[in-house]
Amino acid sequence: FPKPVLGKIDSMVNKKSKYRHVKIGSKTYYFYRLEWVDITGDAGHASVEEFDKFECSKMITHAYIYKKTSKFVWTFASYEEKDVSFSDRNIFPVGCIVKMERILL
């Protein structure tokens, strides 16, 4: 029989995530840094040169990921553990997201 390795079973059972997260109810949500592109609008007059320099806004959001599908990403930044409710919510079309990075502890 192989010799048992002390502590090996405990470390497997109690393995902690190296990523920032919260547990709400029975579900774990991970904290992300999202880089995304937003529309930029201007109702004023512009020259050709000004119009050619017109770009989308490059945005950064820090939030917990509620859920993801192939089309959308739902996020929240505030929550209440007792009533399992979420605030500061957003939904992003996946096509607007440039980068998603899970935040380390």
Regions found by a protein language model. Give the residues of each.
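N-terminal amphipathic/basic-hydrophobic helices that include classical n-h-c signal peptides
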Residues: F1-S11
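Conserved RNA-binding domains used in RNP assembly and mRNA/RNA metabolism
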Residues: I9, V13-L105
